[in-house]
């Protein structure tokens, strides 16, 4: 069951002129299992209180200007798009979509994970976070659209073997569109591809602790206009290609 509830916060009136300040924006809580289409409305703030797991054939639509803030929690909090489900998250230059965390440090939350039916050279597998199946034979599989999105403070680790990146693409197909995506101050990798055929362009990774861009299991898509900016000496590599 998906949880969506609204909390409204208002400020006291301390204005000496007696005018009433505008109310603070409402914040909707998010979390749970999504089995029906869901839309996150433009210019609205959401608090991610647990994992948000989208199951087929549901579509998660995120409109421009949406801000999603993951709660500060010892439990894994992430967004997972399963095989056959979609995410259509389309921001704009002036009004991007922002996914961030209350804990403003690398590893503050678990990031975005997308699983598709495209082939990998390791056969089928399961995501490191969420244990969702991925892989198949549909090179043109479509998991949706990501455009003008910034993800901050990602990289939550369950343990030494199960880590999250900014965005993890698991067997994602070429029908998926990925453009103008940024990850900022993340633990582990910025973008990682586990097989699949998805093509990406205009992607920026700033200060991750491991690899800026990482691909394995025979990813065969294309990548154009990539930028990696690293100031942390602990950063591993700009690119790791297995």
Where in the sequence are the language-model features?
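Beta-strand/loop edge motif enriched in small/polar residues
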Residues: 13-242
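C-terminal motif of bacterial Sec signal peptides marking the signal peptidase cleavage site
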Residues: 8-11
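Conserved small/polar residues in nucleotide/adenosyl-binding loops
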Residues: 1-5
């Amino acid at each position: 069951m998906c949880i969506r509830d609204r909390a409204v916060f208002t400020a006291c009136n301390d204005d000496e002129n007696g005018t009433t300040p505008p109310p603070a924006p409402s914040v909707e809580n998010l979390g749970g299992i999504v089995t029906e289409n869901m839309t996150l409305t433009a210019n609205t703030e959401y608090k991610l209180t647990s994992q948000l797991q989208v199951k087929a054939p549901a579509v998660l639509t995120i409109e421009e200007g949406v801000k999603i803030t993951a709660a500060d929690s010892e439990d894994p909090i992430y967004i997972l798009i399963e095989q056959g489900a979609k995410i259509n998250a389309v921001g704009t230059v002036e009004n991007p979509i922002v996914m961030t965390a209350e804990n403003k440090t690398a590893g503050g939350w678990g990031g975005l994970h997308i699983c598709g039916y495209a082939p990998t050279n390791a056969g089928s597998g399961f995501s490191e976070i969420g244990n969702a199946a991925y892989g198949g034979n549909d090179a043109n599989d479509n998991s949706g659209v990501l455009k003008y999105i910034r993800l901050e403070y990602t990289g939550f680790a369950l343990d030494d073997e199960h880590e999250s990146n900014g965005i993890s693409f698991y067997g994602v197909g070429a029908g998926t569109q990925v453009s103008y995506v940024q990850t900022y101050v993340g633990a582990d990798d910025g973008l990682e591809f586990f097989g699949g055929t998805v093509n990406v362009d205009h992607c920026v990774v700033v200060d991750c602790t491991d690899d800026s861009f990482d691909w394995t299991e025979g990813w065969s898509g294309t990548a154009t206009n990539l930028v990696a900016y690293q100031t942390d000496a602990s950063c591993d590599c700009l690119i790791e290609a297995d």
